[in-house]
């Protein structure tokens, strides 16, 4: 069987480290709007994520398709950004589904990005694939995020790909050492003395170490009994104040100033982002992965943060 994996969104934060790690086991083809001639062993192919073209040939006989495309949500949700966030997810998913449907030899599996934010804001309930409740909560101001997540998965579900199983990666915050991710932001805040609890710090944070994310992706490619939504998250979500305590300890910072909700709202406005990213309580667990025997190398945040800090 071919070892070619086609990766859309391979130049973003998650795609960049994913392609590096899985390139040991697969031949990677990255679909990108701006191909580079020199990218090691990775092949880059041009696409515009809106129309069919020569790039569709890469799907014929491929082992898998992974779609991580989508504009970053780390921005203010004004009208233009809302449109870009939604379209960049829905349209890439739509055109990839159309390409698979037309393929002479379609890939047997399609992993499409989604988000753990699809679940309701909750403090006291674990959200898994079978019993998790989907929907917006006014307290968390997450209506737009839920709208995007549902439209994203609906587009995936509507794609007619009978020979290709489809998996929606409901991914939590990915902790990684590279620039551009949430961990480096939290680390910087901690070193500035701002790594305290936010809005009380009781909201749960769902997260996953970058290595476990990549291993889960490979697992889902190779285990063909998976289909539909899969939570890609550590089995141990923790309160935000506990997360910051761990980061402070590993960074050698003795204290962190707390922030109220209104302070967070002001800071989010100044930094051109949304407070929802921190306020919402996400208590997501990966029941399907655990039931199938997937072993997390970093199930506890203490170990995940320590491993990342050892590389920084």
Show where each model-derived region lies.
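Conserved Rossmann-fold NAD(P)-dependent oxidoreductase catalytic core, especially the SDR/UDP-sugar
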Residues: 94-142
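NAD(P)H-binding glycine-rich loop region in Rossmannoid oxidoreductase-like domains
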Residues: 36-92
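Glycine/proline-rich active-site loop of Rossmann-fold NAD(P)-dependent oxidoreductases
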Residues: 123, 162-164, 175-185, 220-230
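N-terminal Rossmann NAD(P)H-binding glycine-rich loop of SDR-like oxidoreductase domains
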Residues: 5-23
């Amino acid at each position: 069987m071919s070892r070619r994996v086609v990766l859309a969104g391979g130049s973003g934060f998650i795609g960049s480290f994913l392609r590096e790690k899985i390139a040991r086991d697969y031949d990677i083809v990255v679909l990108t709007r701006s191909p580079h001639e020199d990218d090691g062993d990775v092949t880059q192919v041009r696409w515009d994520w809106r129309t069919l073209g020569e790039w569709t040939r890469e799907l014929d006989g491929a082992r898998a398709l992974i779609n991580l495309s989508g504009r970053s949500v780390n921005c203010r949700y004004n009208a233009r950004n809302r449109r870009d966030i939604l379209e960049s997810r829905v349209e890439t998913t739509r055109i990839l589904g159309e390409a698979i449907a037309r393929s002479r030899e379609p890939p047997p599996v399609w992993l499409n990005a989604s988000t753990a934010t699809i679940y309701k804001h909750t403090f006291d309930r674990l959200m898994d694939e079978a019993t998790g409740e989907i929907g917006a909560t006014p307290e968390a101001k997450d209506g737009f995020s839920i709208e995007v997540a549902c439209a994203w998965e609906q587009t995936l579900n509507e794609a007619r790909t009978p020979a290709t199983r489809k998996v929606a990666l409901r991914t939590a915050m990915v902790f990684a050492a590279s620039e551009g991710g949430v961990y480096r932001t939290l680390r910087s805040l901690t070193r500035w003395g701002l790594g305290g609890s936010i809005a009380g710090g009781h909201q749960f944070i769902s997260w996953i170490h970058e290595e476990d994310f990549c291993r889960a992706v490979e697992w889902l490619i190779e285990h063909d009994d998976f289909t539909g939504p899969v939570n890609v998250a550590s089995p141990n979500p923790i309160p935000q104040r506990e997360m910051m305590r761990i980061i402070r300890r590993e960074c050698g910072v003795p204290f962190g100033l707390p922030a109220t909700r209104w302070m967070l709202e002001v800071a989010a406005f100044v930094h051109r982002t949304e407070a929802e990213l921190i306020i919402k309580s996400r208590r997501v667990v990966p029941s399907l992965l655990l039931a199938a025997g997937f072993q997390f190398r970093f199930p506890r945040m203490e170990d995940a943060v320590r491993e990342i800090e050892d590389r920084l």
